[in-house]
From Swiss-Prot:
Domain of life where this protein originates: Eukaryota
Keywords: mRNA processing, mRNA splicing, Spliceosome
Function recorded in the entry: Component of the U5 snRNP complex that is required for spliceosome assembly and for pre-mRNA splicing.
Gene name of this polypeptide: Aar2
One GO process term, biological-process aspect: RNA splicing
Membership in a protein family: Belongs to the AAR2 family.
A Pfam family hit: AAR2
The protein, known as: Protein AAR2 homolog
Subunit structure and binding partners: Interacts with PRPF8 (via RNase H homology domain). Component of a U5 snRNP complex that contains PRPF8.
Organism: Mus musculus
Signal peptide: none
Gene Ontology cellular component list: spliceosomal complex
Gene3D superfamilies noted in UniProt: 2.60.34.20, Aar2, C-terminal domain-like
Amino acid sequence: MSSMQMDPELAKQLFFEGATVVILNMPKGTEFGIDYNSWEVGPKFRGVKMIPPGIHFLYYSSVDKANPREVGPRMGFFLSLKQRGLTVLRWNAVQEEVDLSPAPEAEVEAMRANLPDLDQFLGPYPYATLKKWISLTNFISEATMEKLQPESRQICAFSDVLPVLFMKHTKDRVGQNLPLCGTECRSYQEGLARLPEMRPRAGTEIRFSELPTQMFPAGATPAEITRHSMDLSYALETVLSKQFPGNPQDVLGELQFAFVCFLLGNVYEAFEHWKRLLNLLCRSESAMGKYHALYISLISILYHQLGEIPADFFVDIVSQDNFLTSTLQVFFSSACSIAVEATLRKKAEKFQAHLTKKFRWDFTSEPEDCAPVVVELPEGIETA
């Protein structure tokens, strides 16, 4: 890790007040990063010093000793660091991952006493990118971090999965009425059906909030079903009341957490959750009047997040539809309405103009959502 030019007074303050993360025995050549910076670890690497207090994301990819070009999947973990805090971790050579088990207090204190000698082996936190990091994580509290991270605390780009049913023998497949593997598939769907159903290993999945698949209340009339399918405020209120009863703005922390897990942790499931949560927020027209402060903050969050991703990233390869433009088109049609609180409306108008200028996205066409909506009615409900 190369040193960076830093204001001497700031460097002195961070040296005495910043946190330190010591990682022992990390192999040479490992790709290691913290927040918005990553490096290839050298033989003298022992960790990072002068880290500003707060939430940080550390990540790494192990390399094959025989073939250093072979890089393993990215692993990562969040830490909430305190002023002058010291966290001591070590590399597990067998599992090829950082052991997140708390170090004994005696070892931590011994390491603290030895910090002056260890200093030359600690890389300074790259302060130049701190502002960008804060803009992407300012709603992630320690409580949000603890709530969402896996029980194992390790966030892996590829899920550690197990089969739902262990079927080692042909008779096991027959018992589940599944096609025998020796026969030829007659369709793509049949081929998919033959694949074993998998589930994440217990304790390894990110604990995102469960989002509703039914957007309307039980017993809703056909007219109510149509209304709730166009304006998702009922579904959003359900999520906020169940998952974030104390502070609705905590939903923004989850949105940022998912984005960081995708952007820096390479977790595709996190990107899918980010899309679903954003879709729920952007299509809740009635909620914008009740939670206008939340939506003002949402615009700021999206401004910073969209600055990190290429404009064509959200385009579906097959349909060529852009998820983000269609979602934001619905959002702007509501947020820029005269009925919306003035501060939110003005911020939405400026954000729309910014995106149009930067990405050349068209938000003026009639959104497809304004077309008649065909809604599948629950069993037992008949139209008049």
